[in-house]
């Protein structure tokens, strides 16, 4: 059968918080089967847990943030969550000693490396997939996102940036999900922003940790990072990375096709909520045989980077 996965060992790293600019320690811990993905703030007493759940996402202004009724939050979870999806991790405790996950280099790649360092432990319980049974669509002005039935996990994502540095033929990406494909084609794509927006936000005491080390920065005409892009379609690829992280907030791999036009964290989350709220739109499924799986996850000892 296709089994649930956790980590073999505890791993730790430190990085900078995108919004605070302060040092953040991130600890990833193995968890028992059927625990799910739990984000935990350890710097508050008692510690506060946020189970991966689309209803926990209450702020999507500059990132995906989990917020509880008392206003305790963990921001910028989407890149780590995408890495968990990419590596097929079902059960994990994610601990941070700050209100945000460290931004690292602005991509999911450092988190993939961290998960590979920890190693993957197979658990003797079937992995539970969410299978999309009928189309569900969510619109916001000219932006939209939808799920349709498909025997696999496919992303068809289009952005629309009228900018000299963003080629018009590099604004759409079709990606058939697999662990290998995620690591090689998606995980290294960095977040991006405009210098004028970053300067304004920093004047408001936001994105204080934002820098050329963790984002692609643009002015009105060009990319300001000396090293340029990691690949030509890095912008739309990062939007796919974000969507993979946002959609994995249900805590389970999805079998279906996600199509989107100009979607972002808020719309991704609203679509996920709409799907789960409609009992006829989806069903649980497990796979007795590895061969029958429509989604290919990495072998536990596979080096993908």
From Swiss-Prot:
Pfam families in UniProt: LpxC (PF03331)
Q: Where is Zn(2+) annotated to bind?
A: 79, 238, 242
Gene Ontology MF term list: metal ion binding; UDP-3-O-acyl-N-acetylglucosamine deacetylase activity
Question: Could you say which enzyme class this protein belongs to?
Answer: hydrolase
Which parts of the chain are coiled coil? Answer: none
Could you tell me which pathway this protein works in? Glycolipid biosynthesis; lipid IV(A) biosynthesis; lipid IV(A) from (3R)-3-hydroxytetradecanoyl-[acyl-carrier-protein] and UDP-N-acetyl-alpha-D-glucosamine: step 2/6
Q: Where is the active site?
A: 265
Q: Which GO terms describe its cellular component?
A: membrane
User: Which reaction equations make up its catalytic activity?
Assistant: a UDP-3-O-[(3R)-3-hydroxyacyl]-N-acetyl-alpha-D-glucosamine + H2O = a UDP-3-O-[(3R)-3-hydroxyacyl]-alpha-D-glucosamine + acetate
Alphabetically ordered keywords of this record? Hydrolase, Lipid A biosynthesis, Lipid biosynthesis, Lipid metabolism, Metal-binding, Zinc
Per its Swiss-Prot or TrEMBL entry, what cofactor is needed?
Answer: Zn(2+)
This entry's Enzyme Commission designation comes to 3.5.1.108
Its Gene Ontology biological processes? Answer: lipid A biosynthetic process
Give the matching PANTHER family: UDP-3-O-ACYL-N-ACETYLGLUCOSAMINE DEACETYLASE 1, MITOCHONDRIAL-RELATED
Q: What family does this belong to?
A: Belongs to the LpxC family.
Record NCBIfam families? lpxC (TIGR00325)
Function description: Catalyzes the hydrolysis of UDP-3-O-myristoyl-N-acetylglucosamine to form UDP-3-O-myristoylglucosamine and acetate, the committed step in lipid A biosynthesis.
- Protein name, per record: UDP-3-O-acyl-N-acetylglucosamine deacetylase
Q: Which gene encodes it?
A: lpxC
């Amino acid at each position: 059968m296709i089994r649930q996965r956790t980590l073999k060992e505890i791993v730790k790293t430190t990085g900078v918080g995108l919004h605070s600019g302060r040092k953040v320690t991130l600890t990833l811990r193995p968890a028992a089967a059927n625990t799910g993905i739990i984000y935990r703030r350890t710097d508050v007493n008692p510690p506060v847990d946020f189970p991966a759940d689309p209803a926990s996402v209450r702020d999507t202004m500059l990132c995906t943030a989990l917020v509880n009724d008392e206003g305790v939050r963990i921001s910028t979870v989407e890149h780590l969550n995408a890495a968990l999806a990419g590596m097929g991790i079902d059960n994990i405790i994610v601990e941070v000693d700050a209100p945000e996950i460290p931004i690292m280099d602005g991509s999911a790649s450092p988190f993939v490396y961290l998960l590979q360092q920890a190693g993957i432990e197979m658990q003797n319980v079937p992995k539970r997939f969410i299978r999309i049974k009928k189309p569900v669509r969510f619109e916001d002005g000219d932006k939209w996102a939808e799920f349709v039935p498909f025997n696999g996990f496919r992303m068809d994502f289009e952005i629309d940036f009228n900018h000299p540095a963003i080629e018009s033929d590099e604004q759409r990406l079709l990606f058939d999900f697999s662990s290998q494909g995620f690591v090689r084609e998606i995980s290294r794509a960095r977040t991006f922003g405009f210098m004028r927006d970053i300067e304004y936000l920093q004047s408001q005491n936001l994105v204080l940790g934002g820098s050329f080390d963790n984002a692609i920065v643009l002015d009105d005409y060009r990319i300001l990072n000396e090293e340029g892009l990691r690949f030509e379609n890095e912008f739309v690829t990062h939007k796919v990375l974000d969507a993979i992280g946002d959609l994995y907030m249900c805590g389970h791999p999805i079998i279906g096709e996600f199509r989107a036009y100009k979607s972002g964290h808020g719309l991704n989350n609203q679509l996920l909520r709409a799907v789960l709220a409609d009992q006829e739109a989806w069903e649980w499924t497990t796979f007795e045989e590895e061969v029958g799986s429509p989604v290919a996850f990495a072998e536990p000892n596979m080096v993908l980077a």
